[in-house]
Amino acid sequence: MKILQNSDIPIYKQISSQLREQILNGIINEGDYLPSIRGLARDLKISVITTMKAYEELVDEGLVSAVHGKGYIVN
């Protein structure tokens, strides 16, 4: 996943867009868990809050669900 720090598109939107594309194209399948929020934030060198905002956008769209204590799973 690539993040453009100087883009006009907010970082959380860049993340949610790339994950959405991967889900809709079958790269990430139904039943798969997304990377942990902390792990993705660490890997991308961004804040946990930014990653959480991206994941919550996908929840709002119905693409993923939050599973308490486990993470985010693709619907």
Feature map (PLM): residue ranges:
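N-terminal helix-turn-helix
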Residues: Y33-S65
